[in-house]
Curated annotation (Swiss-Prot):
SUPFAM superfamilies: RNA-binding domain, RBD. Residues 1-111 are annotated as: Disordered. Expressed in central nervous system of the third instar larvae, with a relatively intense signal in the brain and weak signals in the ventral ganglion. Relatively low, but ubiquitous expression level is observed in leg and wing imaginal disks, no signal is detected in the eye-antennal disks. Expressed in all neurons in the adult brain. InterPro entries: Calcipressin, Nucleotide-bd_a/b_plait_sf, RBD_domain_sf. Keywords: Behavior, Calcium, Cell cycle, Developmental protein, Differentiation, Meiosis, Oogenesis, Phosphoprotein. The keyword Flavoprotein does not apply. It comes from the Eukaryota. The gene is sra. Changing T196A: No effect on function in completion of female meiosis. GO terms for biological process: calcium-mediated signaling; egg activation; female meiotic nuclear division; long-term memory; male pronucleus assembly; meiotic cell cycle; olfactory learning; oogenesis. The lineage of its organism: Eukaryota, Metazoa, Ecdysozoa, Arthropoda, Hexapoda. This is Protein sarah. Residues 98-111 have a biased composition (Acidic residues). Interacts with Pp2B-14D, CanA-14F and CanB2. It comes from Drosophila melanogaster. GO terms for cellular component: cytoplasm; cytosol; mitochondrial matrix; nucleus.
Amino acid sequence: MSDAAKSNNNASADAPDPTTPDATGEADAANAATPTTPRGNHNNNNSANGRSKNKLKSTQNSSGGGSIDKLSPDQDIFINAADGLPNQHPSLPKEGDVDSDTEPEVDADSFDDLPTSIIVTNIHSEVFANPELKHAMEELFRTFSESATFQWLRSFRRLRVNYDNAIAAANARIKLHQYEFNKKTVITCYFAQPVTPVSNKNLQPPAPVKQFLISPPASPPAGWEPREEGEPLVNHDLLAALASLTPGESHELHPQSEDQPAIIVHTAMLAETGPGLQVKAPIVQTKCPERA
C-alpha cells in the first residue's frame, strides 16, 4: 500500500461518525440554537393578550360612562342624603391591599356614617321610679363602652344612650334589641337619626309663588300670563227683596212655629227734616210663643 492510500485511510478514520453520540450531541445543540416557539407558550401569550384587552375595555367604559360590572376602587359610592347619611362613602380598598387569608382589622373610621346614639323604647314605667332598675339598665348598656351617657325620657317611656364611637352603638343595637329586662318588658333599640351639619345656617327666602298674583309682576316669571278679571256677581233676588221693603212697615221673614218665634224686620223711617236731633224708632219686642 502506498503512502497516499495510508493517508486517506487515516483521514477517514479520524472523521466523526453521524451515528456516534458525539455527533448526536452536536445536532441537538444546533437544533436548540434555532429560535422556535412552543405551542403552549403561544397559547399563554394569547390568553394574556386577551386579558389585557378586556382590562382596556373596562377602563374605556369607566371613562366613557358605560356600565361596569365591578366598581373601581377610585370611585365614590353616593348614599341617599335624605336619610341623614353623608353624601359620599369612603373609597373601597384596592385589590392588592386586602389579603383573603387574614381577616382585615376593623377601623372605627370606616363607620363614621353610622350614628353613635341609640333610642331604647318600650321601657316599663317602674324603671323610671326605681333608681336600682335605672342603674341596672345603665350598666347593661355600659358593657359596650364605659363612657356611655344616658338621657331618660319619662314622658315618652324612652331612653337615649350616647356612645363615643359607632362600633359600640352598633353592638348595643344588635345585641340588646328585643332584650327581656327585669322579666316584665322587652325593650327595643333603634339608631338615633344623625344630625347632619349644614353649611348655611341662615333661613332661605320663600319661593316666589305669589308673583303670579301681581298684575303685572315686577319681573314676570317664565310662563306668566295676565289673568282675566271675573264678572261682578249681582244677586238680583236680594236687590228685589230689599226694594220691596217699605219704610216704616214691618215685614215677616220667617213665620212663627211651635218652638221658634217669628222673624220680623222693622224698617226705619226716613228723616223729613234737615240735620238735627232724630228720634229713634222704638224697638218692638218679639213675642215668645206660648208653651204648653
